[in-house]
């Protein structure tokens, strides 16, 4: 059964690549050639997230059975082909639906002296209406500036290609979801500009249907491709410094994977809106209730596009309550883990 599935998967990938090469939506060959100056000599490690867990993992699957690791691999292969055509050396951490340990993925990037690390993922949540891009960098925005810059480019290109240039996105530290140490593949490759990209949510029925379509996979790959070109064409690449900031922030414990599929996780936005409304009304009792609701929203969906505002409103409440130490900690959390778009005066990259 598994061997048969792998054979079908290989055949599909061959068809997928063939389809996209002749697709009118694929970037023109002249475009790849014109980008050779930006990518010539660059080593780019592409990490298709997960893999080989269909028999053991019931979390990473859409409403009609499409699995995240299959989507990740399709997009990664397409992106790799685009980058090769433009002159880059491309390293994929996996090329089939197989399990690769997280430490090995980081090791592959380091051993090949990668100039950029791109981990391709897709997201899941209990709310089927949710669908927007999330991009993670490792550690602190003030220390890992190169990855924040690249992450901003990726997020905006994903909005451009998959959401017609409209709608929200999140650019956050991996400490927002793994509050003690961040994500393994980004932690293990720290020093290389790198991100984890969660382009869309396969738990959205409409999105899952799109993610099965080769041309749509190609659009996503094109978004990453354009972001990579923009990054290497930047006149000045920001620095990555030694990690100190994350250890200076008390961990904010949040819902993990399966917990984010629970019914209470669906209340993330309504809890945010209720908390915001109570804060405006004022009064000590309302402030306490607002703080609890905002905290619950941030815990249940820590990387949502309202999570930063949840923390900013929590900060406002803490200031009103005169809790000096808690205020200082919340200020650090916001500054380190939820950077403002274009905070270092980079131009808007959607268009």
Placement of each model-derived feature along the sequence:
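Catalytic-site microenvironment of enzymes
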Residues: 2-351
């Amino acid at each position: 059964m598994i061997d048969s599935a792998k054979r079908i998967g290989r055949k599909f990938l061959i068809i997928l690549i063939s389809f996209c090469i002749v697709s009118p939506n694929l970037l023109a060959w002249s475009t790849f050639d014109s980008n050779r100056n930006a990518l010539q000599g660059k080593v780019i490690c592409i990490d298709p997230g997960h893999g080989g867990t269909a028999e053991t993992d019931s979390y990473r699957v859409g409403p009609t059975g499409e699995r995240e690791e299959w989507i990740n691999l399709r997009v990664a292969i397409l992106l790799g082909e685009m980058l090769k055509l433009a002159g880059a050396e491309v390293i994929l951490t996996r090329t089939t639906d197989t399990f690769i340990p997280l430490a090995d993925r980081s090791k592959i990037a380091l051993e090949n002296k990668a100039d950029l690390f791109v981990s391709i993922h897709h997201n899941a949540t209990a709310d089927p209406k949710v669908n927007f891009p999330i991009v993670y960098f490792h550690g602190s925005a003030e220390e890992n500036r190169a990855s924040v810059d690249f992450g901003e480019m990726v997020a905006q290109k994903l909005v451009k290609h998959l959401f017609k240039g409209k709608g929200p996105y999140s650019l956050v530290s991996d400490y927002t979801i793994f509050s003690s140490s961040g994500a393994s593949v980004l932690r293990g490759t720290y020093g290389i500009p790198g991100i984890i990209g969660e382009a869309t949510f396969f738990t959205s029925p409409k999105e899952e249907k799109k993610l099965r379509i080769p041309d749509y996979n190609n659009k996503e790959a094109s978004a990453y491709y354009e972001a990579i070109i923009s990054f290497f064409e930047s006149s000045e690449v920001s620095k990555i410094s030694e990690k100190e900031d994350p250890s200076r922030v008390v961990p904010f414990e949040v819902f993990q994977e399966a917990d984010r599929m629970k019914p209470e996780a669906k209340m993330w936005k309504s809890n945010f809106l209720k908390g915001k409304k109570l804060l405006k009304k004022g009064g000590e009792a309302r402030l306490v209730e607002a703080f609890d609701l905002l905290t619950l929203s941030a815990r249940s969906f820590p990387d949502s596009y309202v999570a930063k505002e949840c923390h900013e409103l929590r900060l406002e409440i803490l200031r009103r309550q005169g809790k000096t130490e808690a205020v200082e900690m919340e200020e650090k959390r916001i500054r380190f883990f939820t950077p403002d778009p274009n905070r270092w005066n980079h131009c808007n990259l959607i268009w």
